[in-house]
């Protein structure tokens, strides 16, 4: 491109939903002829997409803004922390503009004001699947914004608003474009995937000569037509989640559910304003495993929530023993500015929270190690993410990127595997988190995807 093109640096922080927001902004910048550069020095202006969910994320976002201000001086701030402009401007009064999440138009207007485009837009500069910040072989597919729940520890609705679902045909067309661009795995994300379409009264829309409801199961049926891995994230434990387990058993969806249970004590769940029928939750987990023996269930939990007693924490450990979840993430409760849980009595001392977190993770590590050990001798279909020397680092159908385990393919170099290859791997060993094995010579017939060479500062 011409050296005259205006140059934008970009910092993307936060969750996969925020990453999708960044991809949309970057796509529009490229459509309008802006160059995206990987350093502050080379940038004419810097956009920082922030996170503001928990205190540590706020600190990280403010630090990133400060770094960009010190190194460049021309900074536009957007994202969740942008819902608190006074906090940003108190720390950095010289930022050019502040906007909230999903406010793409305000970001572009701020960029135009600071750095007008120097030529007419060239749509052909951008592939039809847009600019991606993930490797080319997988992509996050955001199906809605906002959330209708009011969990006491969460401030997402105040930042991103109530649930707004994207029409199902719009989502399916985006998925088609991504697959045409080389994507082998679609990761469905939202604040509440199982509530998808409720705000649109499950309206029907046409796609590929068929009507689809704007509903989780119908969306999954449509995505299954694309012939790539489809993985569900952020699934709220509603009863109708059972409807998609059959699709997993039929091989139409990856047998994987990311479903945050948060706790096992009915009283604590009530304080969290979460569903509290723990016995039903256990029954459903067992039913899912009976319907689809291959299913991987990932969940997240909060330990040390205000009022959590020793007995209630022990009940959480008992739940882990009974549920035998495959993948688990946990956090020690941390107050979030604006969350109603901050006002709850009987706050748990920090040292107790950390001790409980350590015990919780040690318990789950034992469970995970045994579940992974049971896969030794099996053959797992894997997607190659990285080539390191002679070893291919991949993920099985049970592993989402960045949050789950890896499969280390010892003979990856010998077979000439490439990033984006789908390959069958015979598992020979395991540890608490990862699997190790050898690719079967006939297992990597799928053509590899090409890694997107895009950097962000």
Swiss-Prot record:
Cofactor: binding comment: Binds 2 [4Fe-4S] clusters. One cluster is coordinated with 3 cysteines and an exchangeable S-adenosyl-L-methionine.
Any one GO biological process: tRNA modification
Function, in words: Catalyzes the methylthiolation of an aspartic acid residue of ribosomal protein uS12.
Subcellular location: Cytoplasm
Species of provenance: Xanthomonas axonopodis pv. citri (strain 306)
Keywords in alphabetical order: 4Fe-4S, Cytoplasm, Iron, Iron-sulfur, Metal-binding, S-adenosyl-L-methionine, Transferase
Listed EC numbers: 2.8.4.4
Domain TRAM: 373-441
Catalytic reaction equation(s): L-aspartate(89)-[ribosomal protein uS12]-hydrogen + (sulfur carrier)-SH + AH2 + 2 S-adenosyl-L-methionine = 3-methylsulfanyl-L-aspartate(89)-[ribosomal protein uS12]-hydrogen + (sulfur carrier)-H + 5'-deoxyadenosine + L-methionine + A + S-adenosyl-L-homocysteine + 2 H(+)
InterPro entries linked to this entry: Elp3/MiaA/NifB-like_rSAM, Methylthiotransferase, Methylthiotransferase_CS, Methylthiotransferase_N, Methylthiotransferase_N_sf, NA-bd_OB-fold, Ribosomal_uS12_MeSTrfase_RimO, rSAM
GO MF entry, a single one: metal ion binding
Binding residues annotated for [4Fe-4S] cluster 1, in chain numbering: 15, 51, 80
Family annotation (HAMAP family): MTTase_RimO
Amino-acid positions noted as binding [4Fe-4S] cluster 2 in the UniProt annotation, renumbered to this chain: 147, 151, 154
Sequence similarity: Belongs to the methylthiotransferase family. RimO subfamily.
Name of the protein described by the UniProt record: Ribosomal protein uS12 methylthiotransferase RimO
All copies of domain MTTase N-terminal, residue ranges: 6-116
Gene Ontology terms: cellular component: cytosol
Cofactor: [4Fe-4S] cluster
Radical SAM core domain segment(s): 133-371
Pfam families: Radical_SAM, TRAM_2, UPF0004
